[in-house]
Amino acid sequence: MIVVDYSDQSNLFDVDCLHYFKRSSVLKGEGRFRNYSREVRPISYCVKNDWLDYDIDYAEERDIDISVFFRKESERNKRGMTNRELVASFVDEYFKHKNIHVGIVDTDGEAGRMNVGREYVDKLLRSKIVVNCNPDDWEGDYRLFETLSCGSLVLVDKMITPAVNPFEHRKHLAYYDSLEELGSQIEYYLDNDNERKQTARNGYEYALKYHKTSDRIDEILEVIGI
């Protein structure tokens, strides 16, 4: 038996299996992998099939400069999302002179990840830059791939989860390691429109070439030798 575990929880299912693939295997706050009693193979999210149908018109101008689809600190409703709240509050405070969106659109949580919300998609397709941030205690979030599939430039915090065909900094997206670096990246790409558009397009095409559901299945099959 093969287990492919995409749950947020860090604990493993107590089952006897040949291979165990786990998404949330990183202890994000300490920048290391969790210690398990068995071999665990990290696996990442991907572009879900529902998100493959959007035609991206790169000649069309986007009217939202920056979007952050997280709650601010003042709107906290659950634990473990402090980093996201800090990022949302930072963008809301320091880029209020720009046309920005900060906050949840449609439904968040599991329901939001399982369904494609039309208002959310509309905001993505209108956004020049989308800032993403992993949860406090693990890595891996569908928003990264949802944003890539809509052709926005992604700014995301640095990750250590290994990936087949990884996204390269400033080629497919941009990584940040602090709020100061995030602010600098935002200012740079808003001032360099052509580079922003090209990087966003690279990320979109790369995601659809190497990070679809079928690609994750191929990665699993390669490990198990089929």
Question: Predicted regions span which residues?
Answer:
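A generic secondary-structure signal
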Residues: F90-E93, Y188, V223
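Short acidic active-site motifs
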Residues: E119, E181, Q185
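Conserved acidic donor-binding segment of nucleotide-sugar-dependent glycosyltransferases
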Residues: L173-L179, Y189-D193
